[in-house]
Design a protein with these regions (language model features):
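C-terminal substrate-binding/catalytic lobe of Rossmann-fold NAD(P)-dependent oxidoreductases
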Residues: 1-81
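NAD(P)-dependent Rossmann-like dehydrogenase/reductase catalytic/cofactor-binding core
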Residues: 64-105
Length: 105
């Protein structure tokens, strides 16, 4: 597994570039389908957002999700998968703190 986070040239927008080696071979459609499924239900609902719309760093500023999965950038080659997730490193973090406080109170 390998990854990098890059702060984009805007005040708060960033992107994560994550590369993983999986036990089984997958294709782009399988990866994107799984991320879409997880984003719409379960523990990551409201935290992970799935999109197939083209994004730029300024689209992320003010976004409350911890990660916006950019399906247009997904790559798969056998066991290797590369995915990208955009996030507003200030606002998304603040929203998760509010979530935590709501659980504690």
């Amino acid at each position: 597994m390998d990854g990098i986070s890059i702060r984009a040239p805007v005040a708060d927008g960033s992107i994560v570039d994550l590369v993983v080696h999986l036990a089984s071979e997958v294709d782009v459609d399988q990866v994107n389908s799984k991320f879409a499924e997880v984003a719409d239900s379960g523990a990551l609902e409201g935290i992970l957002r799935y999109t197939d719309e083209p994004l730029v760093s300024t689209d992320i500023v003010g976004n409350p999700y911890s990660c916006t999965f950019d399906s247009d950038l997904t790559m798969a080659n056998g066991h290797e998968v590369k995915v990208f997730g955009w996030y507003d490193n200030e606002w998304g973090y603040s929203c998760r703190l509010v979530d935590l406080l709501q659980r504690l109170l």
